[in-house]
Amino acid sequence: MNLSVIIPVYNEVESIKVILGRVQDTKLAKEIIVVDDASTDGTREVLRKLDGKRGIHVLLHPRNKGKGAAVRTGLAAAKGDILLIQDADLEYDPRDIPELLKPIQEGLADVVYGSRFLGRAHRVTMFWHMVANRMLTFMTNILYNTILTDMETGYKVFRRDVIGNMVIRANSFDFEPEFTAKILKRNYRIFEVAITFNPRDYTQGKKIKLYDAFEAVWALIKYRFVE
């Protein structure tokens, strides 16, 4: 198994070294691809110093394009046969990576989602943010006849061939619904694994806004009927 961990980053100077250290400590990643989406807080300077060390490969966007664009850049550069998307903000704990990989390693799944709603320990989160996540997941289940608990999770793991002929167009937070819609329409085997979760609030730099929820709704509807 060759695991590529893809980390999209935007203005995470306080957490980037910590998250990279935690991923490295798992000793599972053959490469760690960090895509900086034109950070302005010193993150880029930190990453330049880390580039090439202990499997870290840094890619720099010349201008801010959005999380989805950063993920797509990372996917295009990844060489592993299993790909894992890891947020840089410490909400998702890399110590969960071994459990996320198991269903794929055991031949039970093509795609694994780390679910924040399956009962593992988590910090109390903002009510309306939780409601929005639940509603988007419920909408996904209705449109695509599935029983996911957490469509919007930032932890997604999948075999490389899953995206072999898949065109992802999302540039922003609509990556999650677009990717989910397309794997469901292709009937890939999806497992969900319970993860720990330590959510940030807007004062701590959480970047998801109301507009992103509307964009996600549109993506779910659109990709139900096209591609």
Where does each model-flagged region fall?
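Acidic helix N-cap motif at the loop->helix transition within catalytic regions
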Residues: E14-V18, D41-L50
